[in-house]
Amino acid sequence: MADGLHRVHYNPSTAQLVEFALLRGEGELTANGALVAKTGARSGRSPGDRFIVKEPSSEADIEWGPVNQAFEPGAFEGLWARVEAYLADKELFVSDLEVGADTEHYQPVRVTTQYAWHQLFARNLFIIPEEFNRKDKPVWQIINAPDFVCDPARDGTNSDAAVILNFAERKVLLAGLKYAGEMKKSMFSVQNFLLPAQGVLPMHCSANVGKDGDTTLFFGLSGTGKTTLSADPKRFLIGDDEHGWAPGGVFNIEGGCYAKCIDLSQKNEPVIWDAIRFGTVLENVVMDEHRVPNYKDSSLTENTRAAYPLEHIAQRKEDNCGAEPHAVVFLTCDVSGVLPPVSILTKEQAAYHFLSGYTAKVGSTEIGSTSAIQSTFSTCFGAPFFPRPAGVYAELLMKRIESFGSQVYLVNTGWTGGPHGLGKRFDIPTTRAIVDAIVSGELKDVETIHLDTLNLAVPVAVTGVDSNLLNPINTWGDKALYAEYAQKLAEAFTKNFAKYQVSDAIRHAGPKA
């Protein structure tokens, strides 16, 4: 339906939005039917331009700092009004959507976009409900005005763009940004703030379920394998990035997937490959002269993306929900080549490694990052998206693991035999074999060896995996150099963890520096 007076298109279909995007010059059609859009200089998130309005209802519950930057309520009101005035005579696209597949824990949201392709992205990534807001909850509003230019002196922003969350008014403002991922991560941050108060753990993870109803979760930063490993032809996908874990089950916060495309291949990632078709948005993907996507081309960015609805995946859990997880996998991309490909964690070790969030920025999703791969500690495997203090989420994780009896594993999808540049990265088939062993229950109660410096228990055998790979020292030609790198990594863990106020049992569960 279109409002002729103001040219506002309400709940437009996929076909309509693709047509609008092409007619308005917002993108091009690829040979496989997807819509390619380019985001310009900002081809990733802009963490330096993300703010939360500092107001009485939420102020005491937010961990303020460089991740959660404060914004004054009056400045927000002024900027929101200026953006609304700017959009008043523009053609707009509006949809009523939901975030959260659980019937109790969803949030209704009205998404207004200046671009047709941004609306297509929102309708792909959020949930299109059969009946909007069936519990009549207060509705959130997202306004996305990519062509609006912020003025720091006038608007109180840090640059010409801003992402601002206002919990009191249930508003999200995106101005001056074309990168569509900001929309999904904004509402993820909203749910990350709201869900803990309802006893639900929000998680930066993917999830899938087997034929017997067994759920597995995969935590990890972008590029560590969440989407790839959860898109398993033998299992049913719940979701690839954002979930809630409530007493009794897990649910997808989204209704679609936002898969990295760099070096995508039909052989290694058939589920993702097949999902890219008409209705999919390809972000910053380069095409050849015949409009065939070249997934190896990173000339625009390493952070190329495909945004598609879950309906594009044949093997999926149709209600976007699953039982509580038997297996929880922490995906770490270790650039030092020190960590084993799989470790079996105790509850205390799970809390330690969840708070640490050790991994690497691989093809980083943040603007200004170089193509160099850097190690990082990202609390809860998603520090940029969690407004509350880290301990809130760690306590909820411990509670869920203890009450259900989930087993947690640390899986290294990074390097072995040496650090990045000297060693080699674990290939996808090896990691898939490890994940197969985890989900089958093969690694429960198996014989292990203990790696003293890393303080990790490692299985002595895994079906389909070369046993020499399991203990990382075996893959290094220079054993003394391995010991040196292992000690350096242990020291980095200890230094990073010093900031947390936790029990001795959790503190002593980490590596031994």
From Swiss-Prot:
It holds the Pfam family PEPCK_ATP. Keywords: ATP-binding, Cytoplasm, Decarboxylase, Gluconeogenesis, Lyase, Manganese, Metal-binding, Nucleotide-binding. Binds 1 Mn(2+) ion per subunit. Substrate binds at R45, Y179, K185, R305. PROSITE patterns: PEPCK_ATP. Its main location: cytoplasm. Its EC number is 4.1.1.49. Pathway: Carbohydrate biosynthesis; gluconeogenesis. ATP binds at K185, H204, G220, L221, S222, G223, T224, G225, K226, T227, T228, E269, R305, T431. Coiled coil: none annotated. The keyword ATP-binding applies. Mn(2+) binds at K185, H204, D241. GO terms for biological process: gluconeogenesis. Gene3D superfamilies: 3.90.228.20, Phosphoenolpyruvate Carboxykinase, domain 1, Phosphoenolpyruvate Carboxykinase, domain 2. Its cofactor is Mn(2+). It is found in: Cytoplasm. Belongs to the phosphoenolpyruvate carboxykinase (ATP) family. Monomer. Involved in the gluconeogenesis. Catalyzes the conversion of oxaloacetate (OAA) to phosphoenolpyruvate (PEP) through direct phosphoryl transfer between the nucleoside triphosphate and OAA. PANTHER family: PHOSPHOENOLPYRUVATE CARBOXYKINASE (ATP), PHOSPHOENOLPYRUVATE CARBOXYKINASE ATP. This is Phosphoenolpyruvate carboxykinase (ATP). It comes from Shewanella sp. (strain W3-18-1).
